[in-house]
Amino acid sequence: MEKPFGFVVIDKPSGLTSHDCVNRLRKVFGIKKIGHSGTLDPAVTGVLPIAIGDATRLISYLQGSKAYRGIIQLGATTNTDDMQGEIIESKAWPLITQNYINYLLENFRGEILQKPPIFSSVHIKGERAYKKARKGEKFDLIPKKVTINKLNLISWSQDKGELLVDVDCSTGTYIRSLARDIGDKIGCGGYLKSLRRTKAYNFIENHSVKLPEKSDFYPEGDKPKVLNPNIFFKHLSSFELISEEEIISWRSGRKISFQNNVKRLKVTKNNEVEDSFIHNNHILVLNKENKILGIACLDDSFAIKPKVVFNAIG
């Protein structure tokens, strides 16, 4: 039986860690080689891509932004910047209009400096920030650059003091920090009340399935569908190996001559061949059936050099 290879996109429920979801799928598929592409906080729901089998070796080559829909509660701040923490200050929110809020949100669009929450996985001298925070240690975190591609105000409830927002942002952005900083900008404090991830890299909600509830016995036909990884790597240029000799060389870890085979390269949209390689971009290596054989890059001798090889020989 062919081993499963690809991605399962889970619609993560609230209350479970990302690792809980991975463990559930390990039992469902009966294999250990399963991993997620990025942690979601337990309270957060939504798109959680999980690599199955050797596809775990592709995780580091995923690329793209992440998107969320969340509710920001004005009028209070918490020590975690979300509703899981303790309220440390309360202040009535002002009478404001949706137009005024949109005006203030302009400060958070584009490239900004953002300070992570103290309850976060950021390392401080070899220790996670949240561990220091739990021990009551005082420390400061250095702001880092993040990019907010889109920040749209969907609705504003003056009665509840709630902002409903859609955010598209770079990897590493903390929506909790965004909620905190927006509340500070309005002048009354704020925290993240709820959050759902709607996109991660090229994975969207339409790809997602419910997390299996029972993991001790799962009929073969009922397992979550493993999606072909090709559709999630359209940002990479690709090169096709057409002969059995080339495929054997590739599986043996040898370089493949590229110089006389430029026509077999499919360059990503709006990208020139020179740019694709001068900047050492990664290349998806495929066979004639469009199956992924691995990941390569172009070396100084203008040959395709293996970086990840599936079904390696020797």
From Swiss-Prot:
Keyword tRNA processing found: yes
Gene Ontology molecular function: RNA binding; tRNA pseudouridine(55) synthase activity
InterPro entries: PsdUridine_synth_cat_dom_sf (IPR020103), PsdUridine_synth_N (IPR002501), tRNA_psdUridine_synth_TruB (IPR014780), TruB_C (IPR032819)
Record-listed E.C. numbers: 5.4.99.25
Keywords, alphabetical: Isomerase, tRNA processing
Catalysed transformations (reactions): uridine(55) in tRNA = pseudouridine(55) in tRNA
Keyword Cell membrane carried by entry: no
Active site: D41
One of the GO biological process terms: mRNA pseudouridine synthesis
Functional summary from the UniProt entry: Responsible for synthesis of pseudouridine from uracil-55 in the psi GC loop of transfer RNAs.
Family: Belongs to the pseudouridine synthase TruB family. Type 1 subfamily.
Protein name: tRNA pseudouridine synthase B
Gene responsible for this protein: truB
